[in-house]
From Swiss-Prot:
Membrane spanning stretches: none
This protein's name: Glutathione-binding protein GsiB
Summary of subunit composition and partner proteins: The complex is composed of two ATP-binding proteins (GsiA), two transmembrane proteins (GsiC and GsiD) and a solute-binding protein (GsiB).
Keywords tagged on the record: Periplasm, Signal, Transport
Disulphide-bonded residues: none
PROSITE patterns, A to Z: SBP_BACTERIAL_5
Any single Gene Ontology cellular-component annotation: outer membrane-bounded periplasmic space
Principal location: periplasm
Organism: Shigella boydii serotype 4 (strain Sb227)
The organism's place on the tree of life at top rank: Bacteria
Molecular functions per Gene Ontology: peptide transmembrane transporter activity
Gene3D superfamilies in the cross-refs: Dipeptide-binding Protein, Domain 1, Dipeptide-binding Protein, Domain 3, Periplasmic binding protein-like II
Family that this chain belongs to: Belongs to the bacterial solute-binding protein 5 family.
Signal peptide: 1-26
Length: 512
């Protein structure tokens, strides 16, 4: 009898051990290898897309964008706009709580927008919210936002990933340190942030959408080296990696356990020319440089085919984008124009890049060689984030050393104003925003301003087209390509993908 009991105990112990092992094995933990580090977990104070993308683990906005860049409701159920375009009334979902137990309601929305629109807080994304005059909590599920002047793209500001809802209790508790203590309504909550190595998030048990999230944890791990990032997928150290270096794409595609994804993007790559400085103040010089670049060849050499030549200054999937006939490659025409402009022997200049990764280096080298063929000697410099902030974003027109500048822009609102105004409006020269061409045209300024005062889609189309027509003709840029976004993931990971603005969508992610 004693022996029988002993055997039963052993059987029970074996079953328990097996169950524990099974549970441990079944833990759904995902590692995501990304290309750079995170600056902050406060979306309102982050200028980089990656930090805002990771912050979506904890945070949600009132509205968002789907994979087709169409508006969708998130924490909001609906909205209305007054006839004069000044007042936005937003109805909120009921019964949602922040991860610290605080109710999500109209008062929480007010706390966030009051903080964002107060210049005294010196938040990096203040320019998105500076047109808010006041935010009122009408009742627990109704918010009224009054603008200083009509701004028809305002709903797209609420779509922007910066417009996240942070627990007002956490804002009060942590103040300026909120970037280290994220508390939102999202599917995951912070587990660990090792600022030099990784951010780990864990499932939020109180998440408001039934059955989600399906993963137990996500570890966001910065891996600067392209080859290491790709290797981590092959060894199983990571289940998702972005960006995938183009030179590694073909190799990963052959791996039966990995799926390679090339998705559309709104990431436009271009070279701005400082039109306030010689020789770029001459339209013929700018035209010549556009003829000097072989864009189809650039797509092959620098992007391994994962891009398309630019057909405008706004990517095609952005609302109100206009497409034009691409600049043909014509070095003979380029040399003729340079001669007409007074530079028969070309000139010397500088070409800076906002990034120093391998693709940027290839673009710089290719462009340098192309310009040399028409007599232009370009000294190239690939900058890191610190150099870019100091030398480009932090200096005004008089002290700026920018001449030619290779960079990119992703209009995360999905609407043409954010694709045009920060880059071409006269008031947005650095250090205000990112008009690194120091371009100024009163007609363009007027068209962009008028487009924000109307809610009539036909009128907005007319005004944005008029602005883009002028910009395309005056050529303060060399528009290069619109990138495709290349990511890769383990085939047993589903529901995890890259959005066109280079953010991540992972709410439905699961390990099979």
């Amino acid at each position: 009898m004693a022996r029988a009991v002993h055997r039963s105990g052993l059987v029970a112990l074996g079953i328990a051990t097996a169950l524990m092992a099974s549970c441990a094995f079944a833990a759904k933990d995902v590692v995501v290898a990304v290309g750079s580090n995170f600056t902050t977990l406060d979306p309102y104070d982050a200028n980089d897309t990656l930090s805002q993308a990771v912050a979506k683990s904890f945070y949600q906005g009132l509205f968002g964008l789907d994979k087709e860049m169409k508006l969708k409701n998130v924490l909001a159920e609906s909205y209305t706009v007054s006839d004069d375009g000044i007042t936005y009334t937003v109805k909120l979902r009921e019964g949602i709580k922040f991860q610290d137990g605080t109710d999500f309601n109209a008062a929480a929305v007010k706390a966030n927008l009051d903080r964002a629109s107060d210049p005294a807080n010196h938040l990096k994304r203040y320019n998105l919210y500076k047109n808010i005059a006041k935010t009122e909590a009408i009742d627990p599920t109704t918010v009224k936002i009054t603008l200083k002047q009509p701004f028809s793209a305002f709903i797209n500001i609420l779509v922007h990933p910066a417009t996240a809802m942070i627990s007002p209790a956490a804002l009060e508790k942590y103040g300026k340190e909120i970037g280290f203590h994220p508390v939102g309504t999202g599917p995951y909550e912070l587990d660990t942030w090792n600022q030099t190595d990784f951010v780990k998030v864990k499932k939020f048990a109180g998440y408001w959408q039934p059955g989600l999230p399906k993963l137990d944890s996500i570890t966001w791990r910065p891996v600067a080296d392209n080859n290491t990032r790709a290797a981590m997928l092959q060894t199983g150290e990571a289940q998702f990696a972005f960006p995938i270096p183009y030179e590694q794409a073909a190799l990963l595609e052959k791996n039966k356990n990995i799926e390679l994804m090339a998705s559309p993007s709104i990431m436009q790559r271009y070279i701005s020319m400082n039109v306030t400085q010689k020789p770029f103040d001459n339209p013929k010089v700018r035209e010549a440089l556009n003829y000097a670049i072989n864009r189809p060849a650039l797509v092959k050499v620098a992007f391994a085919g994962y891009a398309t030549p630019a057909t405008g200054v706004v990517p095609p999937s952005i609302a109100y984008a206009q497409s034009y006939k691409p600049w043909p490659y014509d070095p003979v025409k380029a040399r003729e124009l340079l001669k007409e402009a007074g530079y028969p022997n070309g000139f010397s200049t500088t070409l800076w890049s906002s990034h120093n990764h391998s693709t940027a280096q290839k673009v710089l080298q290719f462009t340098q060689q192309q310009l040399a063929q028409v007599g232009i000697k370009a000294q190239v410099t690939a900058m890191d984030a610190g150099q870019r902030a100091a030398e480009v974003e932090g200096k005004g027109q008089k002290e700026s050393g920018v001449r030619m500048f290779y960079t990119g822009w992703s209009a995360s609102t999905g609407e043409a104003d954010w694709a045009l105004s920060p880059l071409f409006a006269s008031q947005n020269w650095p250090p205000t925003l990112f008009n690194t061409a120091f371009y100024s045209n009163k007609q363009v300024d007027d068209f962009l301003a008028q487009a924000l005062k109307t809610n009539d889609p036909a009128e907005k189309t007319r005004l944005y087209k008029a602005a883009q027509d002028i910009i395309w003709q005056e050529s303060p840029w060399i528009p290069l390509v619109v990138e495709k976004l290349v990511s890769a993931h383990s085939k047993n990971l589903t529901g995890f993908w890259i959005m066109p603005d280079t953010g991540f969508s992972f709410e439905d992610a699961d390990l099979q």
